[in-house]
């Protein structure tokens, strides 16, 4: 959108918000959202307020999974951090969490922190990953681990944390195909810090209050091609919708959701109630496709459609196939695909012109 490479602070474009005279409220928490689009907020400046919105865009982001979600045996000593917390301590506060580090999970933040801790003078002993593949981008594995000689142990997890007041070490063990530790494979690593990069959870508490249906795979809202949820007038974008790799995709989604919400709010006549089963068709995910965004589309498409998805296993040379009403409509070859990297396929407008009404749409992967 900016036609340039920008850092996060430059992407904020606060001057545009002020130039367009957009009202914004800082230090304000949204307490509740109803299906009728009534937003309840609370702040020290205004107290509790209620706003009747014409359209709402959900953009609450996601949070890191904490240690409590992992059920790792051991005491609760100092020195256990989520990777994002450690990132803030190092980058913004100027503190080094520890000197001898073990990282559990190979998500992008964990990989980046392995490099960052090394550059700050700490020693990263190992990165352990429960799955048989990394959860991060390939370039981050190369630039953050391989370039610094940091070992990555796949199909391994932490089975015990040692130490009472401060972390003294962790025990790793190899896991089987059901993610169960294999007896006899335990290894002890002395460390004073354990960083957890074990996934992100979309912040959808407000979505549930608004009775928005959630995708059990992504834990984010089910949306159509306009990023509108099944609650009329409520849209979603970014990490609250599904976890992203790149902020470029987040920004593009935000633009789409904002435009669709603005168009909805500007309509003189509100949309009539519609039945999801009659108006929409669900996108079926098969052959290695874990999920798609959007998860459903209108039966009649007049524009091109960009589908983003993740695979559920590592693929070598493969092809992505789109079927419309049981017939192959589009095929795209790829050198590789992995669960840690989001994929996308653009279905051109001319493909939909050949179909009067979409009764079935299916996305699948096939190895070459």
Predicted regions and their residues:
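Single conserved hydrophobic/aromatic residue that forms the stacking wall/gate
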Residues: 1-8, 12-13
């Amino acid at each position: 959108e900016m036609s340039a490479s920008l850092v996060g602070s430059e992407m904020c474009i606060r001057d545009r918000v002020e130039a367009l005279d957009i009202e914004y409220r800082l230090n304000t928490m949204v307490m509740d959202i109803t299906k009728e689009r009534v937003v309840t907020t609370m702040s020290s400046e205004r107290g509790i307020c209620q706003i009747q919105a014409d359209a709402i865009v959900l953009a609450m982001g996601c949070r890191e999974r904490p240690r409590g979600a992992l059920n790792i045996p051991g005491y609760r000593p100092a020195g256990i951090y989520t990777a994002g917390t450690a990132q803030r301590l190092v980058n913004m506060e100027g503190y080094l969490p520890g000197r001898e580090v073990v990282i559990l999970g190979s998500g992008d933040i964990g990989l980046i922190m392995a490099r960052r801790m090394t550059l700050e003078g700490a020693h990263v002993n190992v990165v352990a990953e429960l799955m048989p593949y990394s959860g991060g981008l390939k370039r981050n594995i190369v630039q953050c681990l391989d370039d610094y000689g940091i070992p990555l142990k796949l199909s391994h997890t932490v089975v015990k944390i040692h130490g009472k007041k401060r972390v003294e070490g962790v025990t790793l063990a190899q896991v089987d195909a059901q993610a169960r530790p294999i007896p006899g494979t335990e290894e002890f690593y002395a460390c004073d810090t354990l960083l957890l990069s074990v996934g992100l959870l979309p912040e959808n508490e407000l979505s549930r209050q608004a009775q928005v249906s959630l995708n059990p795979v992504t834990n984010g809202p089910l949306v159509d091609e306009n990023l509108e949820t099944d609650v009329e007038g409520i849209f979603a974008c970014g990490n609250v919708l599904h976890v992203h790799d790149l902020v470029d995709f987040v920004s593009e989604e935000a633009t789409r959701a904002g435009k669709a919400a603005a168009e909805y709010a500007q309509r003189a006549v509100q949309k009539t109630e519609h039945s999801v089963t009659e108006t929409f068709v669900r996108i079926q995910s098969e052959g290695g496709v874990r999920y798609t965004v959007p998860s459903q589309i209108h039966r009649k498409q007049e524009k091109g459609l960009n589908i983003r998805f993740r695979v559920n296993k590592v693929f070598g040379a493969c092809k992505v196939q789109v079927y419309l009403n049981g017939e192959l409509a589009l095929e795209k070859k790829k050198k590789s695909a992995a669960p840690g990297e989001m994929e996308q396929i653009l279905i051109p407008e001319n493909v939909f012109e050949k179909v009067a009404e979409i009764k079935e749409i299916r996305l699948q992967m096939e190895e070459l």
